[in-house]
Amino acid sequence: MKNIIASLLLASSALVSVNASDPVMIGRRGCGYAVENTAEAYHEGARRGFTMMEAHVRATADSVFVTSHDGKTDRLGGHMKIAASTIADLRSETYSQQRDSATYSGSTICTVGEFLDICKEKGVAPLLHLKTFSKDTKDCGHLSPLVGLIREKGMEGSCVILTSEPDYIEYLMATHPDIRLQYQADAKWQEMFEWSTARGLDVQIRADLVDADCVRRYHDAGVKVNVWTVNTPDEYSRLSNLGVDYMVTDYLCPESL
């Protein structure tokens, strides 16, 4: 499978014309060449040329922000629930993951602070993808401490916060208006179009839901479109020709396009 992906990447230059309007490629969970959402994935993503990388954000029982897509660590070989575990507990686990034909192992949990440090060192813009911190989405108590961490690391100028929760958006716009935001609209993009464009929010939409009319409407409203997940040259070509502004990918590294 990895050989097939490599062949597709090499062929992509023949399928896609490179120009000034090329989308920003975002390394999904770092990149697809290490255990997802770990320091190794972020270092490898930066090495492969990503100028923006995504990290999913959750909070531990002792209020440390960590990078993890799932609320539990079992998919990566752990056995803990992040919200019920301390950072010290989570540090005791070692993670592994099979991605296509390769198996990656030996990684441990990464904190958001560490992710931001890597981004700052490598000159990469961080995309912090918030997972829901509480069943009550009006409980926004974690958001100001997260913004405080972003400021502490000196990354407020380049960091983007992505969330599907309108309550989080409203809170952040009211309390931290300088922080850049994206709204994850997906299948709700038409339903939420007026709400998001009235706030000048860039949007993220799943790739199969994006067509020319979708991109045109958002661009006419003066906002940008981010699509996920784009892992083939054909899909890259289709979406690039539509004029999308960002693409989230595991494998389509900028150095290969």
Locations of regions flagged by a protein language model:
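Bacterial Sec-dependent N-terminal signal peptides
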Residues: M1-P23
